[in-house]
């Protein structure tokens, strides 16, 4: 069925049918997608797990009230993402990418094809942005939001801070001969277990850290003696699961699966950067975080404001003065961890 690019609801349905590109950090740590909020503001509540002991009472005495684990709640206006593409008549007179050299495609057909491709492309840029938000939260506990004012050049900066405190400081860097990587991971796991009450099972590392682990003397000391106890501790058989995602192996004694995440993004200045730093590592509990989306309000063709409760809200605009078609995809999203103690960051070098 053809897509009606002039109708926002039709475009929203089309995006929902599209298969979203994979995003390792989002899929691993923030896979839950609750219903979209009906306003642009989202209540973000964070908490630390309590460890209160039940009080004893003497015979015949009544109960004793205990204090609940506290939480902090903040009301955020979910940041708006709004990438767009523009099509003008000159583009329609040229052969599209991968189109036959000798083509019978009309400009109208080429326009429909380009807009369908743009719809998928714009969705991908939003997912990349959410993946960057996930990387920032996992490595710093904060998410810096930089947007542009109406002039298109002035940068406005805001920040969502979850007051994250689980940075692991190492006594010996992992690229050094005396590094005890196994014990460092054990201590980091125990810290998460103590504060979050759950065993972390996923370790995501930058591209250099895989080599540090596989070359580490303290780990190879166990592997060099192939007895039953040592073999049951580690299993390393690196393989690519997808482009830029490499499964390194499993540390069975700590219940940890190790992944090297090599994916990069291009910043506003055109520089290529890694989502996870080359020497960074994140140990965490998977499948608990949420992607909370908020409603988007747009001006419709009748010059009235309409609110759309959707994850992705495409909008089509035709300007007859400039003879341009603009397709924009809007999305409001805040990433919310279940608890702020679900992960720990390790600067390995």
Question: Language-model segments: which ranges?
Answer:
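N-terminal alpha-helical "arm" segments
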Residues: 1-43, 336-349
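Assembly/oligomerization interface modules of large self-assembling protein complexes
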Residues: 32-101
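A general structural signal for short secondary-structure junctions and capping/turn motifs
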Residues: 34, 192-197, 202, 316-319, ...
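Extended, non-catalytic scaffold segments that flank or surround catalytic motifs
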Residues: 50, 55, 154-164, 179
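Long, contiguous amphipathic alpha-helices that act as assembly "spine/axial" helices in icosahedral shell
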Residues: 83-163, 184, 190-208, 323-329
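Glycine- and small hydrophobic-enriched segments that form the cores of compact globular domains
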Residues: 163-180, 187-190
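Ordered core of a single globular domain
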Residues: 183-240
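Sequence/fold signature of self-assembling virion shell proteins
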Residues: 219-349
């Amino acid at each position: 069925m053809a897509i009606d690019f002039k109708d926002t609801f039709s475009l929203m349905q089309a995006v929902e049918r599209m298969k979203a590109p994979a995003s390792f950090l989002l899929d691993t740590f923030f896979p839950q997608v609750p219903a979209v909020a009906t306003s642009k503001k989202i209540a973000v509540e964070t908490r630390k797990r309590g460890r209160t002991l039940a009080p004893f009472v003497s015979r015949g005495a009544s109960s004793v009230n205990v204090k609940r684990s506290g939480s902090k709640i903040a009301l955020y206006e979910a940041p708006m993402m709004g990438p767009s593409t523009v099509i003008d008549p000159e583009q329609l007179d040229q052969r599209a990418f991968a189109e036959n050299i000798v083509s019978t495609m009309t400009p109208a057909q080429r326009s429909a094809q380009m807009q369908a491709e743009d719809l998928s492309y714009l969705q991908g840029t939003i997912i990349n942005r959410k993946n960057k938000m996930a990387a920032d939260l996992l490595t710093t506990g904060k998410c810096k939001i930089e947007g542009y004012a109406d002039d298109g050049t002035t940068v406005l900066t805001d920040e969502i801070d979850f007051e994250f405190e689980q940075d692991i400081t190492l006594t010996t860097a992992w690229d050094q001969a005396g590094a005890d990587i196994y014990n460092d991971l054990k201590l980091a796991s125990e810290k998460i277990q103590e504060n979050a009450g759950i065993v972390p099972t996923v370790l995501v590392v930058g591209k250099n850290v895989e080599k540090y682990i596989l070359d580490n003397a303290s780990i190879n000391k166990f592997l060099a003696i192939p007895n039953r106890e040592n073999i049951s501790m580690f299993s390393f058989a690196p393989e690519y699961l997808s482009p830029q995602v490499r499964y390194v192996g499993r540390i069975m004694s700590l219940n940890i699966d190790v992944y090297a995440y090599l994916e990069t993004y291009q910043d506003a200045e055109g520089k290529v950067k890694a989502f996870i730093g080359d020497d960074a590592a994140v140990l965490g509990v998977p499948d608990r975080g949420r992607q909370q989306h908020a409603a988007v309000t747009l001006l419709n063709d009748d010059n009235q404001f309409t609110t759309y409760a959707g994850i992705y809200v495409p909008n089509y605009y035709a300007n007859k003065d400039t003879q341009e078609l603009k397709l924009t995809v809007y999305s409001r999203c805040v990433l919310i961890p279940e608890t702020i103690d679900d992960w720990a960051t390790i600067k390995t070098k």
